[in-house]
């Protein structure tokens, strides 16, 4: 069946592929990614080469400009953002969305509600002390995931591993990657870690088609955040 073929092509992109990963992809937390594999492979055909992980200079200048602007906004507003999370100290993993696939959800910092050409989702996750995620896959490859540790952790036990590549936030607070690859975030320290997460449209030969597809996806997913982030407390 075409779905199985697409799934096999999709999962084979992993550098760390083994029987455990294949099982997780088809039968575990990658099942939705498997179901969406035909769409994700179509996105690959429309887009520039997928490097899996990226430096900001790997992206076109328009993408770089928006990323740098968002980073600046998070740096300017980090105290205001942290105050929002102070009311939920009992929750180990907490999340806040400013935009979700282009829909504005929180206007406490108006600049995050600007209409961006490439950025479609803007949010913040808080990992409290000794808190990590399980291994998981993002569902869609129409966008790349940008993570930015704006409270600048100082210790090495706070990091992300994406298909075998480890990024320690102490040394590089910005990480851009294809989140349909298996990944896992760790905070093994006794400190909080705030992480901005941003979804940006993949650089593409057919930008308008990508935007049109994402608009349709946004309509479908408008009220589904809790499905994708069921292990998180939303504020």
At which residue positions do the language-model features occur?
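Non-heme Fe(II)/2-oxoglutarate
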Residues: 2-112
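Intrinsically disordered, low-complexity Ser/Thr/Pro/Gly-rich regulatory segments
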Residues: 88-92, 115, 230-235
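A short glycine-rich, His/Asp/Glu-containing loop-to-beta-strand
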Residues: 111-129, 142
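Short, conserved beta-strand element in jelly-roll/cupin
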Residues: 126-128, 139-155
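Short beta-strand His + acidic residue motifs that chelate non-heme Fe in jelly-roll/DSBH
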Residues: 133-136, 159, 177, 183-189
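A short hydrophobic beta-strand segment most commonly corresponding to one strand
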Residues: 145-150, 174-176, 190-207
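Short acidic-glycine-tyrosine-enriched beta hairpin
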Residues: 163-176
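Long, compositionally biased interface segments
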Residues: 198, 202-235
């Amino acid at each position: 069946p075409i779905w199985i073929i697409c799934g096999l092509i999709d999962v084979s992109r992993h550098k760390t592929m083994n029987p455990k990963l294949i099982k997780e992809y088809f039968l575990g937390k990658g099942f939705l990614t498997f179901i969406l594999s035909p769409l994700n492979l179509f996105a690959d055909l429309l887009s520039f080469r997928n490097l899996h992980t990226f430096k900001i200079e790997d992206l076109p200048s328009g993408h770089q400009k928006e990323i740098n602007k968002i980073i600046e906004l998070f740096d300017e507003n980090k105290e205001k953002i942290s105050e929002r999370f102070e009311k939920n100290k009992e929750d180990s993993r907490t999340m806040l969305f400013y935009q979700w696939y282009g829909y504005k959800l929180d206007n406490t910092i108006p600049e995050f509600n600007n209409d961006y050409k490439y950025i479609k989702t803007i949010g913040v996750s808080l990992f409290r002390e000794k808190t990590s995620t399980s291994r998981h896959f993002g569902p869609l490859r129409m966008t790349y995931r940008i993570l930015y540790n704006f409270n600048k952790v100082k210790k090495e036990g706070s990091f992300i591993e994406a298909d075998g590549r480890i990024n320690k936030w102490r040394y590089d607070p910005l990480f851009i990657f294809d989140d349909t690859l298996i990944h896992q975030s760790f905070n093994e320290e006794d400190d909080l870690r705030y992480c901005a997460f941003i979804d940006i449209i993949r650089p593409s030969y057919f930008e308008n088609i990508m935007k049109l597809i994402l608009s349709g996806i946004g309509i479908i997913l408008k009220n589904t955040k809790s499905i994708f982030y069921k292990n998180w407390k939303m504020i």
